[in-house]
From Swiss-Prot:
The lineage of its organism: Bacteria, Bacillati, Bacillota, Bacilli, Bacillales. CDD domains: Urease_gamma. One of its GO terms (biological process) is urea catabolic process. Its EC number is 3.5.1.5. GO terms for molecular function: nickel cation binding; urease activity. Coiled coil: none annotated. It comes from Staphylococcus saprophyticus subsp. saprophyticus (strain ATCC 15305 / DSM 20229 / NCIMB 8711 / NCTC 7292 / S-41). It is found in: Cytoplasm. This is Urease subunit gamma. Belongs to the urease gamma subunit family. It comes from the Bacteria. Optimum pH is 7.0 in phosphate buffer.
Length: 100
């Protein structure tokens, strides 16, 4: 089986998000890459589920809060952009201040 670079990137994101969720479930606060992985994964899955870009932009702010992440992570993550595949094509999702 051969995966394109884009497919490999998505698989790595799934693995990173899964590891981050496991750490979160153990009560650990998430670092920057873990927070980005979880939010990105949830946005990609939302697109796959048929949510609109506007819905995902709003949802992106509800996935994590400051209590979920290490000190300073929310301040570092001021904007996220992720390209997701929707039923009508690929679109860019931008979430401003995803961790509140």
């Amino acid at each position: 089986m051969h995966f394109t670079q884009r497919e490999q990137d998505k698989l790595m994101l799934v693995i990173a998000a899964d590891l981050a969720r496991r750490r979160q479930q153990r009560g650990l606060k998430l670092n920057y890459p873990e927070a980005v992985a979880i939010i990105s994964f949830e946005l990609l899955e939302g697109a796959r589920d048929g949510k609109t870009v506007a819905e995902l932009m709003s949802y992106g702010k509800q996935i994590l809060n400051e209590d979920d992440v290490m000190e300073g992570v929310a301040d570092m993550l001021t904007e996220m952009e992720i390209e997701a595949t929707f039923p009508d094509g690929t679109k860019l999702i931008t979430v401003h201040h995803p961790i509140v």
